[in-house]
Amino acid sequence: MPGIRVKENEPFEVAIRRFKRTIEKTGVLTELRSREFYEKPTAERKRKLAAAVKRNHKRLRSQMLPPKLY
């Protein structure tokens, strides 16, 4: 669990912002959301495969040449 030390004379809002940044970097919230409900191993594999296919299509679209307009 990430934590921060509040510095002397540091505003509360700044400390909260630093804490949120460390939480975001470590990925605690995304893991918490994924573990909120049980997901069957087959459903997890299916979701990961669909995400990989989507990433692949996105990568291929960016590599394609633009159509000629003349």
From Swiss-Prot:
HAMAP family: Ribosomal_bS21. GO terms for molecular function: structural constituent of ribosome. GO terms for cellular component: ribonucleoprotein complex; ribosome. This is Small ribosomal subunit protein bS21. The lineage of its organism: Bacteria, Pseudomonadati, Pseudomonadota, Betaproteobacteria, Rhodocyclales. Keywords: Ribonucleoprotein, Ribosomal protein. GO terms for biological process: translation. Belongs to the bacterial ribosomal protein bS21 family. Transmembrane segments: none annotated. It holds the Pfam family Ribosomal_S21. InterPro entries: Ribosomal_bS21, Ribosomal_bS21_CS, Ribosomal_bS21_sf. It comes from the Bacteria.
